[in-house]
Structure formats: C-alpha cells, structure tokens
Amino acid sequence: MVICLLLCTPTDIFVVASPEVNETQEYVPVNVYHDTDVTRKKIVTAQFECYQKIMKDNDHNKIGPVCNRTWDGWLCWDDTEAGFTSEQYCPDYFQDFDPSELVTKICSDNGHWFLHPESNRTWTNYTRCNEHTNEGRMTAMNLFYLALIGHGLSLTSLLISLGIFFYFKSLSCQRITLHKNLFFSFVLNSVITIIWLTAVANNQELVQRNPTSCKVSQFIHLYLFGCNYFWMLCEGIYLHTLIVVAVFAEKQHLMWYYLLGWGFPLIPASIHAIARSYYYNDNCWISSNTSLLYIIHGPICAALLVNLFFLLNIVRVLITKLKVTHQAESSLYMKAVRATLILVPLLGIQYVLLPYKPEGRVSSEIYDYIMHILMHYQGLLVATIFCFFNGEVQGVLRRHWNQYRIQFGSTFAHSDAMRSASYTASSITEVQGCYSIDSHTEHLNGKGAPLDIETSILKSENPFT
C-alpha cells in the first residue's frame, strides 16, 4: 500500500478516492507535459461545478425509471432515461486523451447505471479517449522530425544568405542591412527552437523537474518568435517611408528600426512571462492550452495587419507613378516590394488558420501537418524570397561566376600553352641530338621555331587556342 501511494501522482490519488472511478481502466494516462497540479485543479473544478449543478437542477417529471445525475470521477452526467446511452466528449485532462472522441455511459433498463461485470461497480467507457494513443505518438514523432528538418533547412539557407550579404560589399545598403537583421532573428529563432525541441520538449524528466532554465528558454523562444515578425514590419515600414513618405529618399535612421525589431518584442514576452507565472504556471510553460498566448500572438497579428496595409499602399503609389511617369526607378522599387508583399501573407496565414482547427481526428492531423510546415519552414521561405530569388543577388553571383570562369579558363589556357611549347622544344632537341644537324639548321629548327610558336600562342586573343 505504501509503495502504491509513493508511485501515484496527486492526480491519480484524487481519482482513486472518487467513488465511481472505473476500476477496469488498466492504463491511467500520465500527463508529462502539463503540471500535475494544473491537471488536478481542472478535475477538482469540474467536480465542484458538477455537485453545484446536481444540487441546483430541478428534478424532471420522471416517467419510468431514470438513472440519476452523477459524478464519475472525471465527468458529470445528467439524468438519463432507462435503456439509453449518454455521450459526451473526452476531457482534456491528459495529453494522450483525444477531446474529439466520445465517452459513453449506459443507463440500464432498470434505471441504474451500468455495472462492470468484473468489478460490479458503476463504469464509464473511457477506452476510446486513448484508443489512438499509439497513432498519436507516431504523428507527434513525425511532427517533431518535420520541425527539426524545417529548422535545419532554414538555418542552412539563412547562413548561406548572410554569407552572401556580408561577402559581396556591392550589396551593402540600408535595405540589405534590414535583411541581415531579419535573417539573423530567424537564425536565432531556429537555434533556440532546435534546442527547445531536443533538450526540453523531448525530455520528460526535465519537464517533470520543471527547472527555471526551461522557463527562461521558453521566454527567449517567444521573444525571438516575436522578433521575426517585427523585423518583417521594419521591412514594410522602411519601404513605405522610402517610397510613399520620403519620395525615394535614400538614407533613413536605422536606430528606430533596431528598437522596434529587437526591443519591442521584449514587452509582450515579459508580460506573458509574468502572467504565466501567476495564472497558468504549468511545467516549463509548455502547454498551449491557455489564452495567455494571445499576449504574444496579438501584437504579431497587429504587426502583420499594419505591414499588409503599408505594402498595399506602396503598391498603389507605385502603380500611380508608373502610369503617370513610366519611371524605371518605380519599376525597380516594385520588384523590391513584390517580395515582401508575397512573404507577409505567407508568414501570417497560420494566424488566419489558427482559430479554425477541425474537430475530427484525421482532419485535425492534416491541420497539424500544415501548421508545422507554415511555422517551421519560415526561415527557408524568407531566405529563398529575399536572397536566392533577389535579382540583385542573382546579378552579383552571375558576374562573379563569369569572372571566375574567365580567370580559371585563362590560367588553364596559359599553363596548357606553356606545356605545349616545352614539349615541342624538348622533342626538337632530341631530334637534334640523334641526327647531328648543323648549327644553321639547329638555329632554325631548335630555337627559332619553338619561340615563335610559344609567342604566337601566348599572344592569341582566344585563351583556349
């Protein structure tokens, strides 16, 4: 008995103490991702509300036998007519419970709740709640590796892009400086996400210990997540100021952009951390089942909407200028805006889809895959659109590649010509030694001719002649 009590979690102890817990449930799910205190509070709250409801509800006009309202340890059940089966959705107390599945409780023909034949106690069928646990675990692992691959690809592409921007000095300008900061924020976000997924979210023992370090890492993760979107906002503000406000003025003070991109996301991240510690202090703040996350998501959605407004206004101004003046400069700015205009909806579509998660198991799984691709492959998307598809970057890379080919080809042709001339000279010298040709012929064949050949080759306009 002592060993049993030591092994049971507080949630398990509470459930066992309840009068109608299903003794036939062989597996009691252990929630490793939520704080057990939070789970226990949910059950206690549901039990309190159930007993209040039982006392307040009036008795219905009973015609025939009826199973009385009751609390079974996890859910509250209303009065049910004899011979009927009552249903409701599975509770969300545990990580491996699927809230889209149904719990059933049978009211027998004699007006009593169904008794399990083995235990002879009232029994509620919760078996469907974790029926797909193994499939859910497989899906969770697939999503885990999908996220790791996405951030790995994002990290690689972003570092290559930053290398291009720093190496080629001809690309240096204020807009590229903003690109560098945007890319760097995505690099940091990918690094902290990989650390979070491998060292925290995948470590049940660490989550159970709930050290302060894992909450600090979650704070940094949410802060960098906000930096991504506010640097996107900086891109939109810069283009709007450059094209609409300053009328193609070139220089702007970047200090305000640094404050907005790196400084402002600290505010919602700090407010979220304080609120989370007081109102939903689960282990490592790993749960997403709290409205406190709107403290983070709200400013991000506002930044996306403001950015979209700026970009649409920029397009309107540029189209007007192109119709009136047909300036080539306006056309160039339109190309610069197009990349940002494409990227903002792509980065923001996850927040459009977020409130509309479907209820079904299969449709919910498809939704999870789509959301993971949208969230964890953003760095790859940003690097591709802002760097690899950038006309300026492509032009610089093409010019340097052509210069390298010409330089390499010239060096190769020069060394080939030298080898050819050396081979000709050595061959004639061998002939000279074998046949003892006179000095006049030796001058013509052994020295003069190869020298002329070598000179003509080295002076040729075609390096591959």
UniProtKB/Swiss-Prot annotation:
The chain crosses the membrane at residues 142-166, 178-200, 212-240, 255-275, 292-316, 332-353, 369-389. GO terms for cellular component: plasma membrane. It is found in: Cell membrane. Disulfide bonds join C50-C76, C67-C107, C90-C129. Pfam families: 7tm_2, HRM. Keywords: Cell membrane, Disulfide bond, G-protein coupled receptor, Glycoprotein, Membrane, Receptor, Signal, Transducer, Transmembrane, Transmembrane helix. The keyword Transmembrane applies. Glycans are attached at N22, N68, N120, N125, N289. It comes from the Eukaryota. GO terms for biological process: adenylate cyclase-activating G protein-coupled receptor signaling pathway; angiogenesis; cell surface receptor signaling pathway. Residues 1-17 form the signal peptide. It is a multi-pass membrane protein. Residues 18-141, 201-211, 276-291, 354-368 are extracellular. InterPro entries: GPCR_2, GPCR_2-like_7TM, GPCR_2_calcitonin_rcpt_fam, GPCR_2_CGRP1_rcpt, GPCR_2_extracell_dom_sf, GPCR_2_extracellular_dom, GPCR_2_secretin-like, GPCR_2_secretin-like_CS. GO terms for molecular function: adrenomedullin receptor activity; calcitonin gene-related peptide receptor activity; calcitonin receptor activity. SUPFAM superfamilies: Family A G protein-coupled receptor-like (SSF81321), Hormone receptor domain (SSF111418). Residues 167-177, 241-254, 317-331, 390-465 are cytoplasmic. May function as G protein-coupled receptor for calcitonin-gene-related peptides and adrenomedullin. Specificity may be modulated by accessory proteins. May activate cAMP-dependent pathway. Belongs to the G-protein coupled receptor 2 family. PANTHER family: CALCITONIN GENE-RELATED PEPTIDE TYPE 1 RECEPTOR (PTHR45620:SF21), PDF RECEPTOR-LIKE PROTEIN-RELATED (PTHR45620). This is Calcitonin gene-related peptide type 1 receptor.
